[in-house]
Design a protein with these regions (language model features):
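Conserved kinase catalytic-core segment
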Residues: 116-133
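Conserved ATP-binding subdomain of kinase catalytic cores across diverse folds
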Residues: 1-112
Length: 133
């Protein structure tokens, strides 16, 4: 297996808690993510959660990103905390799409910068019907 670092990412899109990097794994561009640890030392199990969510979505025939686990020792640039695995997914953005940051999306939708991004996001989301009634 051939693994090479392409780009180490900042952690802005996950509240700054997950270490991420883009790697080429056997010629395929992949996003590799570690796990979190909070100020009290509580370890997050995000790699396992992402793989479980991916598997559930697959069973339910939802469109989804397919995540899988790999041994963290192959990815020294991705920080992990007391786990042996990282989550991995292949590059997922089609060539004819443009990536827009959450920050820019909110400002474009509202035409101003909100004081509370979470509240702004809730206003922008379409109303969701409950799944179970």
């Amino acid at each position: 297996m051939l693994i090479e670092l392409v780009k180490k990412n900042a952690t802005k899109t996950s509240r700054g808690i997950l270490s991420k990097a883009w790697y080429k794994i056997d010629g395929k561009l992949c996003l590799v993510k570690g796990n979190s640890v909070d100020p009290n030392g509580v370890i997050g199990h995000e790699p396992y959660s992402e793989v479980m969510a991916s598997n559930i979505a697959k069973l339910l025939h939802f469109n989804h990103l397919e995540y899988f686990l790999m041994d963290a020792k192959f990815f020294p640039d991705v920080k992990i905390h007391k786990l042996k695995h990282v989550s991995v997914c292949e590059y997922y953005i089609p060539k004819d799409f443009k990536v827009v940051s959450y920050y820019n999306y909110i400002i474009a939708k509202l035409a101003f910068e909100p004081a509370d991004y979470f509240e702004a996001y809730k206003k922008i989301l379409p109303a969701q019907r409950p799944i179970l009634q």
